[in-house]
């Protein structure tokens, strides 16, 4: 039987992704993932391409969508269609926290257009499990 699966996200640690960038997983499926993304002031999410749509709702802080030259603050919502290529940066003095629901893979793109990293729902889930193992934590049931 299928049923709702509530839990307290405060029980999930922030998992490092890159310099000044961490995530708190909320749910993984074969199609996508839901997570909280945290950016420390000045942190940059490098240029990347989405293979599925993305819904991003700013909970706190301000981030600049670099290619669009737009600032998104608390309560701001951004829809990104499949194929969107973008990067962003935390601006201001406080961390940014964004609730993200995304589908499909995401590829990070280097200065010469090469793919430097590919994330899928499965690889991000593996990152979460590895973090839990390395830190002697019991993984939450997020699938």
Where are these regions (language model features)?
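A short, N-terminal "cap"/entry segment at the start of jelly-roll beta-barrel domains
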Residues: 1-33, 114-143
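Well-ordered beta-strand positions
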Residues: 27, 57, 89-90
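Ligand-binding loop in jelly-roll beta-barrel domains
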Residues: 69, 82-111
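A generic structural signal for short beta-strands and their flanking turns/coil linkers
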Residues: 22, 33-35, 52-54, 59, ...
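Short beta-strand segments in beta-sandwich/barrel cores
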Residues: 34, 44-45, 61-65, 77, ...
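Short acidic-glycine-tyrosine-enriched beta hairpin
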Residues: 28-29, 64-87
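Conserved short histidine dyad/triad with adjacent acidic residue
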Residues: 18-20, 29-49, 81-85
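Glycine- and acidic-residue-biased ligand/ion/polar-headgroup-sensing regions
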Residues: 41, 50-67, 73
